[in-house]
Amino acid sequence: VIANSNSEKDQNLKYIVRDNLINYMNTLCNNCKSKEETIEVVSNHISNFTDIANQTIKDNGFSYTANVEIGNFEFPTKTYGDISFPAGYYDALKVNLGSSSGQNWWCVLYPSLCFVDVTSGIVPDESKETLKDNLTDEEYKLISDRNDSTINFKFKLIELFSHNHILTAKN
């Protein structure tokens, strides 16, 4: 969902539209068992998503409209707790509000990572299991492994002096 602008009112509306669309999607796609099935169901109901978004906009006193489309869109890296999705192109339902020049909110349609606890960013175990079932072991490892490697900063000049036993200061 891409807000009309970054004004507080437009950003708040974005979340109201989001919540209404998620509620509809939850009932519509609750029993979907694959990404392909989810895309098919959403595609078949695209006009309903548009109607819900437009009605929400109108009910909240705004005069612009929503444009809703399904496609393959570019997304930034997104991390939910211990799951990270790399930046790239993903199949998604894209909702543009008004001029769509504001900040966006995005989620993964399948499995339903839209429904995570936004405050803690925790991915439910059920969604993790669905990911495991739909990804190869290598793909799942890529998104779920935490990179806990430590970064060590070094100064080459200090290493050179230390290695060659060169004193830099005397008492």
Which residues fall in each region the model found?
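Solvent-exposed loop/turn segments at secondary-structure junctions
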Residues: 6-7, 73-76, 102, 113-115
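Short flanking/linker segments adjacent to small metal-binding domains or redox-active Cys/His motifs
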Residues: 142-171
